[in-house]
């Protein structure tokens, strides 16, 4: 979740900042000078939308290191560190990707993979994960993160986010133009965008951005199922990944009901924004997988 949450927040911030800068540079005035130029607006929205997503992707690795306090390791330290690096290398070779950077950070059980390119990524695990799981479970979690890299999930999410951003920028400015035109309908001397346009577009950039995040989060949840399956393939069996998920969920595999029903850890709006499916659904998907 940390990996995608950082990406989404960075992306939203970049889009809002770019929108404000565009207003200050007079781009909005150009678009509305003689009525709204939809063709120019669509091009502007595309550049803004994908620009924000690509900048977020390129910044994802350094931001993740900084925000999580990741300490990069090379396997020359403790025996545990050497094992982590060897495990990442083994899975990277199996998956056909370049060796990622490997790091450790302080905190509760967690792990993430990030980076703009498959051959220049980062896999980081927390001290809580190393202390609270068996080696086999940690190995499964590492396999899950390597699978994210091999599947190209960060690039895929960037493309999806770029499309969402484009719609957000386009719609917010069309609605902003309509609101501004209505507010100044009796002002014959008005020219260019007014305060109604600027306020509406900034507010809608934020509101529609959060709504778009629901769609991005849905796609992210589907990628998690694929990464779980990828970890099982790298491990050669499903049980280690099932055990790791059960450990993360605070339950022992033997205590799981035979017919797991799909139920969310958090209901309502929280589940819509969640980048990960409920643990129970992920375990059930692995248990029901063929092969």
UniProtKB/Swiss-Prot annotation:
Task: Give a GO biological-process term.
Answer: proteolysis
Mind listing the UniProt keywords for this protein, alphabetically?
A: Cell inner membrane, Cell membrane, Hydrolase, Membrane, Metal-binding, Metalloprotease, Protease, Transmembrane, Transmembrane helix, Zinc
Instruction: List the membrane topology term(s).
Output: Multi-pass membrane protein
Q: What does the UniProt cofactor note say?
A: Binds 1 zinc ion per subunit.
User: Any stretches that span the bilayer, and where are they?
Assistant: 4-24, 38-58, 159-179, 199-219
Q: Which InterPro entries match?
A: HtpX_protease (IPR050083), Pept_M48_protease_HtpX (IPR022919), Peptidase_M48 (IPR001915)
Q: Which cofactor does it need?
A: Zn(2+)
Localization recorded for this chain is: Cell inner membrane
Q: Identify the residues that bind Zn(2+).
A: 144, 148, 224
Write out the similarity annotation.
Answer: Belongs to the peptidase M48B family.
Q: Does the keyword Calcium apply?
A: no
- Give one Pfam family, short name only: Peptidase_M48
> Which HAMAP family does this entry report, sorted A to Z?
Pept_M48_protease_HtpX
Q: Report the domain of life of the source organism.
A: Bacteria
Q: Does the keyword Hydrolase apply?
A: yes
Active site per the UniProt annotation: 145
Q: What Gene3D superfamilies does UniProt report for this protein, alphabetically? A: Metalloproteases ('zincins'), catalytic domain
Q: What is this protein called?
A: Protease HtpX homolog
Entry EC no(s): 3.4.24.-
In alphabetical order, the GO MF annotations are: metalloendopeptidase activity; zinc ion binding
Q: Name one GO cellular component term.
A: plasma membrane
UniProt enzyme class: hydrolase
């Amino acid at each position: 979740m940390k990996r995608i949450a950082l990406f989404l927040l960075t992306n939203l911030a970049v889009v809002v900042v770019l929108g404000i800068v565009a207003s200050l540079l007079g781009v909005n005035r150009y678009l509305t000078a003689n009525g709204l130029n939809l063709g120019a607006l669509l091009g502007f929205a595309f550049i803004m939308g994908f620009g924000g997503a690509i900048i977020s992707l390129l910044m994802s690795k350094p931001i993740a290191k900084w925000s999580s306090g990741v300490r990069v390791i090379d396997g020359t330290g403790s025996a545990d560190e050497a094992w982590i690096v060897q495990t990442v290398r083994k899975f990277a070779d199996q998956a056909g990707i370049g060796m990622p950077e490997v790091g450790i950070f302080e905190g509760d059980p967690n792990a993430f993979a990030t980076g703009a390119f498959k051959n220049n990524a980062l896999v980081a695990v927390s001290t809580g994960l190393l202390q609270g799981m068996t080696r086999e479970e940690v190995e499964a979690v590492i396999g899950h993160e390597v699978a994210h890299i091999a599947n190209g999930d960060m690039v895929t999410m960037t493309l999806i986010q770029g499309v969402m951003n484009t719609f957000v920028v386009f719609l917010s400015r069309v609605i902003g133009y309509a609101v501004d035109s209505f507010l100044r309908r009796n002002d014959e001397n008005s020219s260019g965008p007014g305060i109604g346009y600027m306020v509406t577009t900034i507010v809608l950039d934020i509101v529609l951005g959060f709504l778009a995040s629901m769609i991005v989060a849905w796609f992210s949840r589907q990628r998690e199922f694929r990464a779980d399956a990828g970890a099982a393939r790298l491990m050669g069996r499903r049980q280690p990944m099932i055990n790791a998920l059960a450990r993360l969920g605070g339950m022992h595999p033997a205590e799981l009901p035979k017919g797991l029903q799909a139920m969310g850890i958090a209901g309502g709006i929280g589940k819509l924004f969640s980048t990960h499916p409920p643990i129970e659904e992920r375990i059930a998907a692995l248990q029901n997988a063929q092969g």
